[in-house]
């Protein structure tokens, strides 16, 4: 049997001790990772959720804290506004440099994320341990580096894992989690990840190290929880954000609605990220078996399962698996990590990619509105049938995001990607064309329906005598109910 190497996933140095020169991270591989993610982040912005976050930031800068949701006609007055720090940051970037400023911000954060991902495997011996886990994680992250608030969440997760892996002081996690609570809801999974890796080390560590490791992880978790409390207190409605995950996931109806959104659906084998995440999880689990570390094996399986349970959790799992896989694969194989000329070459390539990403972000085009009904909304605007509080327009969620970006607080949107529960339940009934779809339209007092052509609801409206298709524009049908004079 192979010798059993040290099992701890963190460096053995005391907190605050400088990392030895031979364990420091060469600038080449992290620069390459930064360049790859930066270039992916430089593509024109076509994300629907970003539009609402930017619109929210504009409201925060122009009018201050709004009373309730400022965009949805259906939202209750006490509706919370999550990710408000991120929304404000987007609006500031827009004021400074327009949409180019937002893209530059996205590129910079994506590049920093690439550096952090590679740093999570720093100091491991061999190419397999130091390169394979971060390389696979970067592949997983490619579709997710968009100007949504989850980008800041991924970055803060990386910082939290670096704090633990490099044995930084526990109080570092206070500002990390205080910020995290106000930028993205993945802070809850950050606590879960810290607990999982702490449990793995407790189970696998030699008896003499368990007590000291337990004290350190308890301090880190305490700092994280304290940071959550501080962040919750900074929200204008004290601690509302801390309880928001329970509001969203607490009831059966809420869970059913959430599962209707693509980002909360399980990841299947038809998706490329399924296999890349499975590869990373298998590497971590296989290394744990080789090292006879049941705790690390269990953590790898649980993290991989968490990521596959919902698309939005895939990046969280991938980032979390990097230090675990690097530790279990440490010393495997005879090929050394890149150094010398090879590392310098990787760094040069990465620097070129970063430069190309910055150039693309500045030059444009900045926005990609191909999936949105721009022309159809133009037609509705010409008829006076949109952005009017006296006209109820029912539409799909991503259309609501576009209306909020285009019209701001005058959007009077029916739904977006963060509606209240009652509206979300009704919206799912429309999307799935449940038998009560006509009652849903009645509850919304719908006068106009703007929906994708050939969707089940579009076909159902074609058979409904009280609805008339006015026109089809770029794949979207405009429907009007009886009595709407502007549609005649």
Question: Where are the predicted features?
Answer:
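Specific aromatic-rich, kink-prone transmembrane helix
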Residues: 116, 137-140, 152-167, 195-198, ...
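Short periplasmic/luminal acceptor-recognition loop of GT-C membrane glycosyltransferases, typified by
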Residues: 385-424, 442, 446-453, 479
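Short hydrophobic/aromatic helix or loop-helix immediately within or flanking a transmembrane segment
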Residues: 76-100
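Periplasmic/luminal catalytic loop of GT-C fold multi-pass membrane glycosyltransferases
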Residues: 426-482
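Transmembrane-helix motifs of polytopic, lipid-linked glycan transferases
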Residues: 104-123
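Membrane-interface alpha helices of multi-pass inner-membrane proteins
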Residues: 37, 137-141, 158-163, 170-185, ...
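Membrane-proximal, lumen/periplasm-facing interface regions of secretory-pathway glyco-
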Residues: 338-385, 398-401, 407-410, 419, ...
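Transmembrane catalytic cores of multi-pass membrane glycosyltransferases
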Residues: 44-45, 49, 61-66, 75, ...
């Amino acid at each position: 049997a192979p010798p059993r190497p040290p099992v701890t996933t963190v460096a053995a140095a005391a907190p605050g001790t400088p990392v030895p020169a031979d364990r420091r991270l060469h600038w080449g591989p992290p620069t390459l990772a930064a360049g790859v993610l930066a270039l992916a982040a430089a593509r024109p912005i076509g994300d629907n959720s970003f539009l609402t976050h930017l619109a929210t930031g504009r409201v925060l800068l122009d009018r201050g804290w709004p009373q309730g949701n400022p965009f949805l006609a259906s939202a209750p007055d006490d509706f919370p506004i999550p990710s408000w720090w991120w929304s404000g940051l987007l609006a500031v970037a827009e004021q400074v440099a327009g949409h180019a400023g937002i893209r530059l911000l996205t590129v910079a954060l994506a590049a920093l994320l690439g550096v952090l991902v590679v740093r999570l495997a720093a100091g491991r011996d061999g190419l397999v341990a130091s390169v394979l886990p971060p390389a696979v994680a970067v592949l997983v992250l490619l579709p997710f580096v968009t100007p949504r608030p989850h980008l800041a969440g991924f970055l803060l997760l990386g910082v939290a894992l670096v704090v633990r892996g490099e044995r930084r002081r526990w109080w570092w996690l206070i500002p990390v989690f205080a910020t995290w609570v106000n930028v993205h809801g993945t802070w809850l999974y950050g606590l879960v990840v810290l607990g999982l890796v702490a449990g793995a080390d407790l189970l696998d560590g030699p008896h003499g190290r368990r007590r000291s490791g337990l004290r350190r992880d308890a301090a880190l978790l305490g700092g994280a929880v304290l940071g959550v409390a501080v962040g919750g207190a900074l929200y204008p409605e004290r601690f509302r954000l801390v309880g928001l995950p329970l509001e969203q996931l607490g009831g059966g109806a809420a869970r059913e609605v959430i599962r209707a959104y693509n980002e909360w659906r399980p990841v299947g084998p038809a998706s490329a990220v399924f296999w890349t995440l499975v590869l990373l999880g298998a590497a971590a689990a296989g290394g744990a078996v080789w090292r006879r570390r049941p705790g690390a094996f269990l953590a790898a399986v649980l993290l991989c399962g968490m990521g596959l349970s919902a698309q939005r959790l895939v990046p969280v799992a991938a980032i979390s698996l990097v230090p675990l896989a690097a530790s279990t694969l440490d010393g495997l194989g005879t090929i050394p990590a890149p150094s010398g000329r090879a590392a310098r070459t990787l760094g040069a390539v990465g620097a070129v990619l970063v430069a190309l990403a910055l150039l693309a972000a500045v030059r444009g085009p900045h926005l990609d509105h191909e999936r949105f009904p721009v022309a159809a909304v133009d037609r509705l605007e010409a008829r006076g049938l949109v952005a009017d509080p006296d006209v109820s327009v029912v539409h799909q969620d991503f259309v609501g995001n576009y209306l909020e970006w285009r019209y701001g607080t005058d959007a009077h949107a029916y739904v977006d990607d963060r509606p209240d529960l009652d509206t979300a339940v009704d919206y799912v009934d429309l999307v799935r064309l449940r038998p009560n779809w006509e009652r849903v339209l009645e509850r919304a007092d719908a006068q106009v329906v703007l929906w994708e052509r050939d969707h089940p609801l579009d076909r159902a409206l074609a058979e409904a005598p009280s609805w008339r298709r006015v026109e089809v524009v770029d794949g979207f049908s405009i429907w009007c109910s009886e009595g709407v004079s502007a549609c005649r």
